């Protein structure tokens, strides 16, 4: 399947988190910030998710539900994402990645900005090399999905540290705009 675009109406997804909780996208009561990350031990991803965790109350107050997908198994994700206060979903077969057009690229790890973020992430202790079936070449992607299933905004990352910040997300949710990248 190709890339998702703003204004596109998504079919309903029924997912299960790594803790066994059901997640429905779209959520009839909340905007959904659907994030695609790399592998469970990714230092850049885990550093980014800690920033989401620190400001999770603000995100919830803005009417947004976080749903984060990794191309890892539940077992691989538990040590790294098991304590997060939002939904995390294992997609080791990358079915959701294909459905949403989320790619891989050597540039994911070659861009200089990724090196600094990776070092900062390793320093937090929440990092490990890719495990069996995982890849360091995954690119991140972000989607803001309305209660009706319409894509309000999206971003396909060009390298491993190219994703929306919390400020970006809150701004987009407030404006309900349609930027592309």
Predicted regions and their residues:
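A short, polar/charged loop-to-alpha-helix boundary motif
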Residues: 160-175
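N-terminal "domain-start" segment that seeds a small globular fold
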Residues: 1-25, 51
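Thiol/selenol-based redox catalytic cores and closely related redox-interacting motifs
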Residues: 91-161
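Cysteine/selenocysteine-centered motifs that mediate thiol-based redox chemistry or coordinate metal-sulfur cofactors
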Residues: 179-181
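Structural microenvironment flanking redox-active thiols in thiol-disulfide oxidoreductases
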Residues: 48-99
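Short beta-strand/turn micro-motifs composed of small residues
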Residues: 37, 70, 146
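Short loop/turn microsegments at loop-to-beta-strand junctions
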Residues: 10-11, 33, 139-141
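Short active-site neighborhood of thiol/selenol oxidoreductases, capturing the structured segment around
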Residues: 24-53, 66
């Amino acid at each position: 399947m190709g890339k998702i675009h703003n204004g596109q109406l998504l079919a309903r997804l029924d997912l299960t988190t790594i803790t066994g909780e059901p997640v429905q996208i779209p959520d009839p009561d909340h905007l959904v910030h659907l994030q695609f990350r790399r592998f469970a031990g990714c230092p850049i991803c885990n550093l980014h998710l800690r920033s989401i965790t620190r400001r999770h109350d603000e995100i919830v107050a803005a009417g947004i539900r976080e749903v984060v997908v990794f191309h890892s198994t539940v077992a691989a994700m538990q040590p790294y994402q098991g304590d997060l206060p939002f939904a995390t979903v294992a997609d080791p077969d990358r079915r959701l990645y294909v459905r949403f057009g989320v790619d891989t690229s050597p540039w994911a790890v070659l861009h200089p900005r990724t090196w600094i973020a990776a070092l900062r992430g390793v320093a937090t202790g929440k990092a490990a090399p890719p495990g069996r079936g995982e890849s360091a070449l995954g690119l991140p992607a972000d989607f803001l999905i309305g209660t009706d299933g319409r894509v309000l905004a999206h971003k396909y990352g060009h390298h491993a540290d190219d994703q929306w910040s919390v400020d970006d997300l809150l701004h987009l949710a407030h404006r309900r705009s349609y930027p592309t990248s």
